[in-house]
A protein has these predicted regions:
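Membrane-embedded alpha-helical hairpins and interfacial helices in multi-pass inner-membrane proteins
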Residues: 102-182, 186-187
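Hydrophobic transmembrane alpha-helices
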Residues: 1-54
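Central hydrophobic cores of alpha-helical transmembrane segments
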Residues: 7, 53-63, 106-115, 173, ...
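Membrane-embedded alpha-helical segments of multi-pass membrane proteins
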Residues: 5, 30-42, 80-89, 164-168
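Hydrophobic alpha-helical transmembrane segments
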Residues: 4-6, 53-54, 81-85, 107-111, ...
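Short, charged juxtamembrane terminal tails flanking transmembrane helices
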Residues: 1, 184-194
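Structural signal for the C-terminal ends of transmembrane alpha-helices
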Residues: 16-17, 42-50, 89, 93-101, ...
Length: 194
């Protein structure tokens, strides 16, 4: 449990630092390389009931506080609320895997939830952003290149980085859960059954 909580703390620091680097223009290639979906998936699968959903959402909220203050963005708007909803869907999938969370289930689930998260958030952007035509071509634009003002980081790049980061951070989380002492692993197994 302690390694998992340590990882969540590291996630906030990682997301805040990469967000600040991206904002400064020093690391645009890191756009959307964030471990939040992996944390939502893994927390729901591995952690005790009181942490399953609250920890990922609190992690997102704290990192949003830092980044939105930097970007001078609103803390709550429809796009952000959609992101929270999509993260909750990812958590529900992790919750469904809680009794069979292994390498064989969690790594493919990380890829599937990346697709789901990307689909939900980009479809929402397409539906709500007046910059997209409300037809199939507009949806394809939202899913591939995005809006012209964001040409430096097209949508497909966000998706690629999301896939890579979700897979990598899920692997790290599962590894940390596996290397715990037998006693800690037994505590997690008992907590998962609750």
């Amino acid at each position: 449990m302690i390694p998992a909580l340590f990882l969540v703390i590291c996630v906030v620091a990682f997301r805040a630092m990469t967000g600040l680097l991206i904002h400064s223009g020093a690391a645009t290639w890191l756009s959307n390389f964030a471990p939040l979906a992996a944390i939502a998936l893994c927390c729901a699968a591995y952690l005790p009931s009181r942490y399953k959903f609250t920890l990922p959402l609190v992690t997102l909220f704290i990192s949003d506080l830092i980044l939105n203050a930097t970007y001078h963005a609103a803390l709550f708007d429809p796009q952000i609320l959609c992101r929270y909803l999509a993260l909750a869907v990812v958590g529900l999938i992790g919750f469904a895997l809680r009794r069979r969370a292994t390498w064989k289930t969690m790594l493919p689930a990380s890829l599937a939830t990346s697709v789901i998260f990307y689909g939900i958030t980009n479809a929402f952007s397409w539906l709500t952003d007046p910059g997209y035509a409300k037809n199939f071509a507009g949806l394809v634009q939202a899913l591939t290149v995005g809006l012209p003002q964001y040409a430096a980081t097209p949508s497909w790049m966000f998706f690629r980085n999301s896939l890579l980061s979700d897979f990598a951070f899920t692997a790290v989380f599962v590894l940390l859960m596996r290397v715990q002492s037998p006693r800690a692993s037994a505590e997690v197994a008992v907590a998962r059954a609750a």
